[in-house]
Amino acid sequence: MRAKPLVLTLGDPAGIGPEITVKAWEALRHQKTYAFAIIAPENIISAAGGKTQIIEDLSRAPDIFESAIPVIPIAGQSSTFGNPTCQNAKTVTQSIELAVTKTLEGEAAAIVTNPIAKDILYEAGFKFPGHTEYLGELTKNHACPYTRGPVMMLSGGGLKVGLATIHMALKEVAQTLNIDTILTTARIIDGALKCDFGIETPRLSLAGLNPHAGESGALGQEEIDIINPAAKILRSEGILASDAQSADTLFHSEARKTYDAVLAMYHDQGLIPVKTLDFHGGVNITLGLPIVRTSPDHGTAFDIAGQNKARADSLIAAIKLARNIATNRDDYTSKNHVSG
């Protein structure tokens, strides 16, 4: 059976999304496995230097992918690279919503999202902290083949790191963390490692919140009161979860041999090691959704947009990983008779 194409979203049209989409197509155009279409105003992709062909039927994308970028057209305001405006907010969200619909309806194998500028969207009334939460809302009425999310995971440099908390001030993290949050997030990561990454018996390492994982309570109680009790419950469920590990030694090469993924307690704790090890090739994944979603692990880069300076490494990695996850998920659901 012919593989379904992937679908890319526009992201902010004033950012580097259009440029890296063109560069990703140039790198992948001869590999039909990674065929995609982008949902965008056609003129924006053309302005980034892309050879485009408008399609209405997503299934046509693989047939024309080698010769042109398949574009599913939507309306949009005129846009200048490097000059974002909230007037484009509707185009940005429409691209995301249509991509989600096409993936939920089985037309696309997965969605790959280009970077958005949340502050620009907020000016137009956008009410979600980011892509992760927005996608969770758009798909909330559909079943996932494992525990529902959404959970943010970063992949790169041989690491897979999920986050217990995402976009919040550091001072709020300790107040937000609780046993239930860790249990839910860990269960989703465990399910994703099995379903989306094909790891039969995944090992999950839990990072401590405090320096030296609290040093037996001398530097904080969260490990004793929250993280370790959660780990004990997870182990009773058959999930191979460690007690809280000191985050300063958790990511070196020898430590990485002892786990398949890390559950970090806050945003920078998880993202710094991934971006340090693989700054250009990291991928953002949303776990626990009924659809497969990946994204490049960088922002809109308005300062270099339209200057042919942007690297497409992360988007290319996101496209390849989206295809791999979609294939793994299909295999898992078929083998285990799971409906998604």
What residue spans do the PLM features occupy?
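Detector for methionine-enriched segments
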Residues: 1, 152-153, 168, 265
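Ligand-binding beta-strand-loop-alpha-helix segment within the catalytic cores
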Residues: 154-184
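Small-molecule pocket liners
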Residues: 36, 132, 150-151, 159-162
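A broadly tuned "polar low-complexity/structure-edge" signature
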Residues: 133-140, 164
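Short, flexible loop segments at boundaries between secondary-structure elements
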Residues: 138-151, 155-159, 289-303
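A broad structural signal for alpha-helix termini and local helix breaks/kinks
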Residues: 49, 139-145, 168, 197
